[in-house]
Amino acid sequence: MADNMTTTQIEVGPGATNATINFEAGILECYERLSWQRALDYPGQDRLNRLKRKLESRIKTHNKSEPESKRMSLEERKAIGVKMMKVLLFMNPSAGIEGFEPYCMKNSSNSNCPNCNWTDYPPTPGKCLDDIEEEPENVDDPTEIVLRDMNNKDARQKIKEEVNTQKEGKFRLTIKRDIRNVLSLRVLVNGTFLKHPNGYKSLSTLHRLNAYDQSGRLVAKLVATDDLTVEDEEDGHRILNSLFERFNEGHSKPIRAAETAVGVLSQFGQEHRLSPEEGDN
């Protein structure tokens, strides 16, 4: 990253989560059709079964965060996924699919655009880092944790204990890392917890994560325009603790925005959302 680039914004969307799930459902449909033709070997059959289990779990979790009118079954998503493949393979953006709108940059040398340069859907025009509301929703009794003169092990344990007090639903958690009375990093997290019958809680959706450097300046902001949904239903503590561990180890050196962004996105397998310049750092 260039020296003058000190702030990173990652905008996810539009429709990225649904598009990914639907596309993988289309892949599953292809696997199943190949299996019906008795053309799938044993390793392929194993991949089919694992993909199906993963998708069923992810769809179940994702549907919880969607209004009832937008919830879809695996079979419905398979049909959409197959259409998406046709759009990608045959370069036909006219086959409009809700939640999946390929962005085509026309080649100026050919107005008919037979060969298109396909890229990710661009961020919302005019939405700069400081234009986006920092705390999009009111949260009752937000939790703030100040970790003073603690080693990382004790700090992570305190975060785990505090997060465990959160009620089901949306939450806001502010973590302030204070070492030798020097406020080295602050992390603000917005998300949604689900409470399970066995008493455990899981972080179902991460809406927003901001990281600030020693001077309080915003150095990285993860904006989930189409909420980043945690795929598994493991306890959300693991994600929060891992993020915190990556962000701050008590070093006095400035926090690098690119490193912070990589740390956030790697928790969700979303490193590909970084620009090439950020990824190289």
From Swiss-Prot:
Q: Where is this motif: Nuclear localization signal?
A: 50-55
Compartments it resides in: Host cytoplasm; Host nucleus
Chain segments carrying region G1P2-binding: 1-103
Enumerate the UniProt keywords alphabetically. Host cytoplasm, Host nucleus, Host-virus interaction, Inhibition of host innate immune response by virus, Inhibition of host interferon signaling pathway by virus, Inhibition of host ISG15 by virus, Inhibition of host PKR by virus, Interferon antiviral system evasion, RNA-binding, Viral immunoevasion
Which portions of the sequence form the region RNA-binding and homodimerization? 1-93
Signal peptide stretch: none
What residue ranges are annotated as transmembrane? Answer: none
Is Repeat a UniProt keyword of this protein? no
Q: Which domain of life is it from?
A: Viruses
A single GO BP? symbiont-mediated suppression of host PKR/eIFalpha signaling
Entry-linked InterPro entries? NS1, uS15_NS1_RNA-bd_sf
One annotated Gene Ontology cellular component of this protein: host cell nucleus
For this UniProt entry, the molecular function terms from Gene Ontology, in alphabetical order, are: protein serine/threonine kinase inhibitor activity; RNA binding
SUBUNIT field: Homodimer. Interacts with and inhibits human G1P2 conjugation by UBE1L.
Record-stated family: Belongs to the influenza B viruses NS1 family.
Which purpose does this protein serve, as stated in its record? Binds and inhibits the conjugation of the ubiquitin-like G1P2/ISG15 protein to its target proteins. Since G1P2/ISG15 is an early antiviral protein, NS1 may inhibit the host antiviral response. Prevents EIF2AK2/PKR activation, either by binding double strand RNA or by interacting directly with EIF2AK2/PKR. Also binds poly(A) and U6 snRNA.
Name the UniProt record assigns to this protein:
Non-structural protein 1
The scientific name of the source species is Influenza B virus (strain B/Singapore/1964)
Q: Which gene encodes it?
A: NS
